[in-house]
From Swiss-Prot:
InterPro entries: DUF354
Protein name: Uncharacterized protein MJ0665
Pfam families tied to this protein: DUF354 (PF04007)
Gene3D superfamilies, alphabetized: Glycogen Phosphorylase B
Organism, scientific name: Methanocaldococcus jannaschii (strain ATCC 43067 / DSM 2661 / JAL-1 / JCM 10045 / NBRC 100440)
Length: 341
């Protein structure tokens, strides 16, 4: 058996940005870690871009049946691996498998959560976590309803770590991104992200195609959309939006864009933190972290198409500076090191 210090599990692409600085701290301090991830979207590609060494185990499911089957298969695969390296502590953000495997192998779990509405995930994970790190705006009482305890809050959002992983030079912003995408920078660039096809955002009409059609009639601009699946790609190509054919550097594109409209969460918050005018058209109740950024005048929320169009026309290109908020990296590092003494 190999004895390692830390196990980190990544389950979505933004987690690569989020944990980047923590991993660099581990490497600097000689802390031995194991990185695992699953086959999901462009996650594996980002792990490669960041030059991280990790092991891909399992994949993402779209249907409820697939989610359950792939969850079980991934738990088995991770158990086989982790039982042979026996780390002193495990850390993840919203991974449903890490808490179950770590709990079963008697490994302490530090869990990062910023979505108080992800009922299924939270029920499966929070009761098994020894410590829960969360943004101050994430509703602690709601998390307690799912069995969470031992909360540690920070004054910011998780996307602060995402942005800092790029702005602090670990993987520098690519200021040639527009040119690489063949986008004319004579016109402003608007980035859009549709609603996720997930367990917490189903059955809501996508208003972005209609917004695109209206904007194209009123503004000379580049509209770049990051669809979440092949069906969405077809929809946005039909309205003549720019749909990247391959995995591209979304954070660099945001940094070099003039506006963001999103029906999701992560890209909206990254955009707001970068100081880009941002509209959330998320169709359900907002997360606490979104309300937090709205209160700081970094984002607005509306599903009214006319209001969105008017806001774009009034604010296109009116960037603010990067907002100063707490980066959770130091807190995560401190809590991990507490188990390595």
């Amino acid at each position: 058996m190999i004895n390692l210090d830390v196990w980190i599990d990544l389950t979505n692409a933004p987690h690569v940005h989020y944990f980047c600085q923590l991993i660099k701290k581990f490497e600097k301090e000689g802390i031995e870690y194991l990185l695992t991830f699953r086959d999901s979207g462009n996650l594996a590609k980002l792990v490669e871009i960041y030059n991280f060494v990790g092991k891909c185990i399992g994949k993402h499911g779209n249907t409820l049946k697939d989610k359950l089957i792939f969850y079980a298969e991934r738990v088995i695969g991770l158990t086989e691996l982790i039982s042979n390296v026996k780390p002193k502590v495990a850390i993840a953000k919203h991974s449903v498998e890490l808490p179950r495997v770590a709990f079963g192998l008697n490994i302490p779990v530090i869990f990062v959560v910023d979505n108080e509405h992800a009922e299924a995930q939270n029920k499966l994970t929070l009761p098994l976590a020894d410590e829960i790190i969360k943004p101050i705006a994430t509703d602690e009482n709601k998390l307690k309803e799912f069995g969470g305890r031992n909360f540690i809050s920070f004054e910011g959002t998780c996307e602060v770590a995402n942005v800092n992983s790029r702005l602090k030079g670990y993987y520098p912003i690519d200021n040639e991104i527009l040119k690489k995408l063949g986008i004319c920078d004579d016109n402003p660039t608007i980035v859009m992200r549709p609603c996720p096809n997930s367990s917490y955002c189903n059955g809501h009409k996508d208003i972005l195609p209609k917004i695109i059609e209206k904007l194209q009639k009123r503004i000379d601009c580049n509209i770049v959309v990051f669809p979440r699946d092949e069906h969405q790609k077809e929809i946005y190509r039909e309205v003549n939006a720019i749909v990247p054919k391959e995995t591209i550097d979304a954070l660099s594109l945001l940094y070099n864009s003039d506006f963001m409209i999103g029906a999701g969460g992560t890209m909206n918050r990254e955009s707001a933190i970068l100081g880009i005018p941002t509209v959330s058209c998320y169709p359900q109740e907002l997360l606490g972290v979104d309300k937090y950024l709205i209160e700081k005048d970094r984002m607005i929320h509306t599903n009214d198409i006319k209001e969105i169009i008017n806001y774009v026309e009034d604010n296109l290109g009116k960037r603010m500076g990067v907002i100063e908020l707490e980066d959770p990296t130091d807190l995560m590092f401190e809590r991990v090191c507490n188990y390595l003494k």
